[in-house]
Amino acid sequence: MTCPIVTGVTKACRDSKGGLTTIYVTEHSNLIQASITSASGILTNVATFLNTGKKFWTIEVEMNVGNEIETINSDRPTGTTAYAQALNFYIPKKQASIAQWVMTLAQNDLAFIVLDKNGYYRLLGQKYGMGMTGSTAPSGTNMTGEQSGYVLSFAGEEPVLANEMSAALVAAVLVAA
């Protein structure tokens, strides 16, 4: 076999937390693909991998309304594997400024950095980008307990699972060059 298993997995503490705390977005075309380096699932860049003057923009998400899901799709007969990436989050309050922002996102191929509740950053849409899919802007019916805003969903497909990023690298790509 050409893909030997070289390590095992030990049982971890039961302290993992689900959900996202912060999301960052940029146009996929802002990434300089040739300058993105990784090893063992972690980006190894020590400086930004964005075009000059570009940055990731912050999206603050409410508690328990954002998640990312990676689905491993392997086809034994063809010997191929791909990794579907999905990002979902909710922005409350329907308003003109957010509607314009949402329409801009819908028109672009995007890359996202997500920060999960365990303190890990991951880069989504690294090679091929992600696009908006199946998003809605519900008004809700009741005064409380229902969403009134933008329920946004993005999907992409990548050759590897999302790479982790260090906090230092995230700080570098958040600063406008």
Residue ranges of each PLM-predicted region?
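Oligomerization/assembly interface segments of phage tail-like spikes and tubes
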Residues: 77-96, 146-160
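Generic secondary-structure microfeatures
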Residues: 63-65, 85, 90-95, 114-118
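Generic "edge-of-domain/loop-turn" microfeature
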Residues: 30, 66, 94-96, 119-121, ...
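Short, acidic/charged, Gly/Pro-enriched secondary-structure junctions
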Residues: 102-125
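Solvent-exposed edge beta-strands and adjacent loop segments
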Residues: 3-4, 11-88, 130-144
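Mixed-charge, glycine-accented linear interaction segment located at domain edges/termini
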Residues: 129-177
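Short, conserved charged micro-motifs
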Residues: 96-103, 163-165
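A general structural signal for short secondary-structure junctions and capping/turn motifs
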Residues: 79, 102-104, 113-114, 142-146
